[in-house]
Amino acid sequence: MRIKDILYWRVYYKILQLCVRLFYYLPVNKHKFVLMHDFGNAYGDSPKFIAEEIIRRGLPYDLVWLVNNMSYSFPKPIRKVKLSHIKSVYELATAKVIITTMKGRCNLKKKKNQFFMYVPHGQIGAKFVERQAGTTLNTEYINGSKWHSSVSDLFISSSKLFTEEMLTWYWYDGEVMECGLPRNDIFFHYTPNDVKRIKTEVGVPENVKIVLYGPTFRNEKSNDPYAIDTDRLLTALEQKTGDKWIFLFRAHPNFVWYGKPAFDYSDKVIDVTNYPDMQELLLISDVLISDYSSTMFDFNLMHRPVFLFTKDIEAYQKMRGLKDWYFKVPFPFCHNNDELIQAVQNYDEQKYHEACKSFDKFYGNLETGTASQQIVNRLETIMR
């Protein structure tokens, strides 16, 4: 970056911080929501389903979505505002309710009559988190997470185990609403037309089955942890089921900054990283391959098979730490391509479902498909 650019952003940051302090004295708009998904991502995740429930009810609220890219498409009446623009500071300062999916600092000096809600971007994860992760997280992230917890009025939880974790490791001792995640409501209320629409948007034939690969992020550029042999996998699935299959790859959002893993893309191996809604991709998929991501629990709500491709499990355990219960999940661990193919060949639907039901009880699953309704009910009482 050129010196001129560095100076520009330093000055701009100073101006933003000045605006944060000045806008603190502006009145709060009792009908305004500000929603933010993953620090400026497109229309998706739980805020999308909260917004759609508000719109469905015809509630007279001003819905503002903070984005990094103004070309993102949003339904009316949602207003897009550039996250890095001074206008976003104004929207945050004057909003009654602020909803985020990521823990971290934003350009806000919170007022007593504002309500700050955290809806996690995933269910409970296998990796060590927050205070539990210790020195594996950088100081900037830890400070941002502590700030986020200090201003939060409500955390949303999807399981009893997640609630326990939040209150133990997240530097948070406030209220936790145990209702499930709005983004997972879709798994309880979809129709065949929903599946058909999404497949059309993705570019997948209606009569083809889908295996979705959604790995978590690593702080390294090696392609080795993600090296699934797609040809062998698709052949094994076709032999197991007698159906035609397509492999979809969905990269973690952080891969944008580090470069995502490479596959030999074709009409049977498709990159869907830019598709805005991960839950819709899960909905149309018949098999999920993941690793240490909480996506496995989202997908399991539909009782469809999950396989864990954990080629680097020992290295990842040393780098980030993995919780003890992770090694008890009912999903097959596959440390290489041979084990992945064998797991597909040996899959037994009845035994798998029984194991999943038992694990649901262990971690206290709270998903019922009504999270959006419950949260908007709560927000209506706050907006009065």
Region locations from a protein language model:
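Membrane-proximal basic amphipathic "stem/tether" segments
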Residues: 1-40
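C-terminal amphipathic helix plus adjacent low-complexity
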Residues: 1-4, 24, 337-384
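Conserved catalytic-core segment of nucleotide-activated headgroup transferases in glycan assembly
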Residues: 43-55, 179-261, 367, 371-373
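Catalytic binding pocket for nucleotide-activated donors in carbohydrate/polymer assembly enzymes
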Residues: 178, 264, 294-363
